[in-house]
Amino acid sequence: MDWKIELVAVPVTDIDRATEFYTRIGFVADHDQRVDETLRFVQLTPPGSACSICIGQGVTDMEPGTQTGIQMVVPNADEALAHLTSVGVEAKGVDDLAWGRFVYFNDPDGNAWALQELPDYSRLDEWREEHGVSL
């Protein structure tokens, strides 16, 4: 049996501002539904992903800005950093680690994201030697 993550809730203060932010960085706004006066659900999907995020009113009990540890895989960390900065997002990186190359950014509410370029595992021993890391 396959188990696949479908949605991750991201708590925000301003739904429209967050929707604009995520679409500006490349997410697709799949759904924007107001069910009633207490529930509005916006589903946004990163390019190439089968998993989406949802933002809105009444979708999570988390406080805005408290979602951390969301990580996406990108083909090239340098290009991802360049893209984010080109659309006005403050991002930091590229951090070169044995387990990948990372770029970090926050959404307007402070929810923290990491983008990971997967390493060439065939070069892991070389990386460890260059960085003085032993097992």
Task: Give the role of each language-model region.
Residues 3-7, 65-69:
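Short, solvent-exposed beta-strand edge segments and adjacent coil->beta transition regions
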Residues 2-3, 9-51:
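Core segments of cupin and vicinal oxygen chelate
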Residues 7, 32-33, 40, 81-135:
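Vicinal oxygen chelate
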Residues 47-51, 60-62, 76-79:
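Short, charged/polar surface micro-motifs in flexible loops or helix N-caps
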Residues 49-53, 110-113:
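Short, charged/polar, Gly/Pro-enriched secondary-structure boundary elements
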